Amino acid sequence: MSASNPDGAITRIMKIVNEKGLHARASAKFVQLVEKYDATVKVSRNDDSAGGDSIMGLMMLAAGIGTSITVSATGPEAKQCIDALDALVSGKFGEEE
């Protein structure tokens, strides 16, 4: 489910379902996808947040399997970016398990 914030951001809560969580390879795929869109992305978990364009920042969120992350995007392609990221996360980052 997506929601628009007063600042125009589109926000969606995504559950991490891949076995290894938001590790280096998954974070790299996330960043590569973000970079395809004209959007600025922020990812939050609990009280921590990171830019969607930072592999290290995403890894520092320590989002393991079963945790939820809040992903917000602004910009002309924010909705498309959020939809693509949701598909990536729910698709286990394309990992075979």
Regions found by a protein language model. Name each.
Residues S2-N5, A28-E35, K79:
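A broad, low-specificity signal for short, low-complexity segments enriched in glycine/proline
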Residues K15-I65, A73:
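Compact, glycine-rich, soluble single-domain proteins
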